[in-house]
Every structure is written in structure tokens, then in C-alpha cells.
């Protein structure tokens, strides 16, 4: 990395202009894999939660083992869930958004109106 590259990145940061890179950093649900947005309604214990999904259904979601200790999920958190193929009333949590990421998605109208509680 040359000094010119460093100077340009600092200039972009200082000017406050959003470039294409900043938009690409927020993870979005992969619709081809069946992933969707959801809002955590209730913690049910034992790594289970009740999630209101963007299609209007409330699903029983579970937190996979790889995320249990690493990512703490609370009520009213925005998450990405993937419904099970053989039991569509259940789902797995794929990703949890921070409050900053969720408000960014809401401001840029990337959330469906059904679950946009950040208005």
C-alpha cells in the first residue's frame, strides 16, 4: 500500500462521503438460500427464541452452537433467519445485526415495513 492510497482513504473518511465500499459491508439475507430478516420477539431459553419474520409468520428459531457464546441475542434485535425446509415453522439464526447496522438498514429503506421497528 503506497502513501497515496493511505492519503485517499483518509480523505474519504474525513470528508464523510459514503462510497460504494461502505454499503457493501452490511450483510444482507441471501434470498436464494431462503434467508430473511426477522425481529426477536421473545427469548424462550435453551438457545431458543420466537422471531417475527418478514413474511409475517412467527417462527421458533434456535441459535446454532457456533454462535451461542460468541453472539448474545436479546429481544428486539434484528436477525437473519433461515427457515427449515422440512418444518417451516422453525428456523435457524444466521446473523445478528448491531443497533448501528439495524438503524443504517432502516434509514436506507432496506428493511421490509413489516419488521421495520426503527422508524
Swiss-Prot record:
PROSITE patterns: IF1A (PS01262), S1_IF1_TYPE (PS50832). Pfam families: eIF-1a. The keyword 4Fe-4S does not apply. Residues 24-98 form the S1-like domain. Belongs to the eIF-1A family. Seems to be required for maximal rate of protein biosynthesis. Enhances ribosome dissociation into subunits and stabilizes the binding of the initiator Met-tRNA(I) to 40 S ribosomal subunits. This is Translation initiation factor 1A. The gene is eIF1A.
